[in-house]
Amino acid sequence: METKHTKFPTPPWDMEIAAERLVFEETTWNSHEPDKIIEGYADNIEMRDGVEFINGKQELKQFLKRKFEKQLDYTMKLDLWGALKGRMAVRFEAEWRDASGRWYRNYGVQVFQFNDHGYVERRFASQETISIEK
């Protein structure tokens, strides 16, 4: 069982309650603080983000540190497309810049599976990245 004291909606949920849970995801990811983000994830998290595979909270924390060192000024918007029991399907877009100042946008989909306590157990994201003008 998870030891964090974070409170958020737990499954099973409808679209409205699932959207409330996504607020936590969006807010913490936009904080760029790995310790805050991993509060919403199970210790045994299994995750794929693009071409990276992550297993466990410590790998997730290291992945996030690398991500935010490379993807500066990262902002993400999540759009719930479906929710059933402890699963969600989400469309997302994110913008960020690299160290040279060039801006990018990611478009993609994420699927989540949550445990009974509301922690993400599985998260798989497929995305494409395009260069944009700011």
Language-model regions, residue ranges each:
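Residue-level signal for short amphipathic helical patches enriched in basic/charged
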Residues: 32, 48, 115
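Short, low-complexity N-terminal intrinsically disordered segments enriched in polar/charged residues
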Residues: 1-43
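A beta-strand edge to alpha-helix "cap/lid" segment located at domain peripheries
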Residues: 2-13, 61-134
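Structured beta->alpha junctions
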Residues: 26, 51-52, 80-82
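Short beta-strand segments in beta-sandwich/barrel cores
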Residues: 45-46, 95
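Short solvent-exposed beta->alpha transition segments
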Residues: 46-68
